[in-house]
Regions:
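Short loop/turn segments immediately following beta-strands, especially the blade-tip
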Residues: 93-100, 147-156, 200-209, 247-254, ...
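A short beta-strand motif characteristic of beta-propeller blades
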Residues: 56-63, 99-112, 154-171, 206-218, ...
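Solenoidal tandem-repeat scaffolds enriched in leucines and small polar residues
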Residues: 138-269, 273-275, 295
Length: 436
């Protein structure tokens, strides 16, 4: 259900939005292009789907606990995949023309490497047939990956050995999160927890090899925290503590890596996304300079290009990225500021910045109250912002550098920690091979 009246009051009270944030428009005038909005509230064991054009809740997956760290993989034609931590299991979900989500397959994830805590990272292949679910077992160099063939309804789980690294945060030896990739030809499972990249034969794992040996290995930087892969699955990499490293895939293993330092002193990028061009990674990170500003950093998968743009100080959402701009919301003192960063001529998101103060909707102050989640339609015409504890999602239309608040969508739960959002369009071409 859409609630435009709350926004009208909020915009009137602000009185400072001329030229940047237009007043709400009636629903009949809006022309949203994102068909469905997936809204998850793990604390409430709730996953629902809303019609982005009307705000109507069209269906739900009762009892599902969407793993927000691993996120959602877009598989195309209205199909998504995510880990339901209530299982745990990998759910492949189809959202059809009615907006009702249907579980196409549900694959249990056995615990073979130790007590299951959560899925760390999930990924699919460029053909969007296979999915890999990696574990996140703290303090252990023995992890596991479940590989699922969604076409054959076949799944196998393998134990994977990772390495200890010198932790950038403490200087001591320890373990990091394991990242997963499904890339290359023939198809390989590539994993890293820092220190090295290991490549495994997917056909051998699906054939029953539960303790596979790597078919190729190459050195890799420490402290990876954000897997990135181009849409064709030919180059992979990660955001590290001090910069970004990418490695091309060869038939026999790996090519020469390319490393580039962050342009501004910062903590490692937080969950970068792949841009629609399939070759540019974009994420938000916290700077270490005066005021610890939020930085929006973008980098090329194929060259040395990297750029950072300061957005202001405060708690930041994950970035979203569209063909024409990247965006994030920074919250400070209870005020949400949306920043749109235009895509530059070289393909990086380092162009003009448009910042917009968003209207308040009665969110309360207190621990966790600054939690937000931002999602964008594939073409960038719409943004959706959740706010912790409000039980609603703000809708924003974007045209050029003008953002127009359209209304809010009331959702079935409070979104106590900000929840999780993803847009799903049956005509959307997937360009990101990792869960986001």
């Amino acid at each position: 259900m859409r609630i435009p009246s709350l926004l009208a009051a909020g915009v009137a009270a602000l009185g400072l939005l001329a030229g940047s944030l237009a007043a709400p428009v009636p629903a009949a005038e809006a022309a949203p292009r994102a068909r469905w909005l997936l809204v998850a509230d793990p604390t409430a064991h709730a996953v629902s789907v809303a019609d982005a054009s009307t705000g109507r809740i069209t269906g739900a997956l009762p009892g599902a606990v969407l793993g927000t760290h691993a996120g959602v993989i877009q598989m195309g034609h209205g199909r998504v995949a995510f880990v339901d931590e209530a299982g745990p299991r990998l759910d492949v979900v189809d959202i059809g023309s009615s907006g009702v989500p249907r579980i196409a397959s549900s694959t249990p994830i056995p615990a073979v490497a130790g007590a299951w805590t959560r899925a760390g990272w999930i990924s699919d292949d460029p053909g969007h047939r296979f999915v890999a679910v990696g574990s996140d077992i703290d303090g252990s160099t023995t992890q596991q990956v479940t590989v699922v063939d969604t076409r054959r309804q076949l799944a196998r789980t393998a134990k994977i050995s990772t390495s200890e690294v010198t932790l950038a945060t403490t200087g001591e030896r320890g373990t990091e999160e394991m990242e997963t990739f499904l890339v290359g030809s023939p198809l390989r499972l590539v994993v890293t927890a820092g220190g090295r990249l290991d490549s495994y034969d997917v056909s051998a794992i699906l054939g029953g090899d539960a303790n596979p040996a790597p078919v190729a290995t190459t050195p890799f930087g420490a402290y990876p925290h954000g897997p990135v892969a181009d849409a064709r699955g030919t180059v992979i990499g990660s955001t590290l503590h001090d910069g970004i490293e990418t490695v091309p895939l060869t038939r026999g293993g790996f090519g020469a890596s390319v490393s580039r330092a962050y342009p501004e002193p910062a903590v490692q990028s937080y969950r970068p996304r792949m841009a629609p061009d399939g070759e540019t990674a974009v994420g938000t990170q916290t700077g270490t300079g005066p005021g610890a500003p939020t930085l929006l950093t973008s980098s090329s998968m194929r060259g040395a290009g990297v750029a950072s743009v300061a957005l202001g100080s405060g708690a930041s959402t994950r970035a979203v990225v569209t063909p024409g701009y990247a965006a994030a919301v920074v919250t400070a003192g209870g005020v949400d500021t949306l920043s749109l960063v235009a895509r530059g001529r070289a393909g990086l998101y380092d162009g003009a910045v448009t910042s917009v103060r968003l209207p308040g909707l009665g969110q309360v102050q207190g621990a966790g109250s600054a939690a937000r989640f931002l999602a964008a339609s594939d073409d960038g015409s719409e943004l959706f912002l959740s706010r912790a504890g409000t039980g609603s999602v703000l809708e924003i239309d974007v045209a050029g550098t003008t953002a127009t608040v359209r209304g809010t969508i009331a959702v079935p739960s409070a979104l106590a920690d900000g929840g999780y959002l993803a847009t799903v369009d049956p005509h959307q071409r997937p360009h990101d091979l990792s869960g986001r």
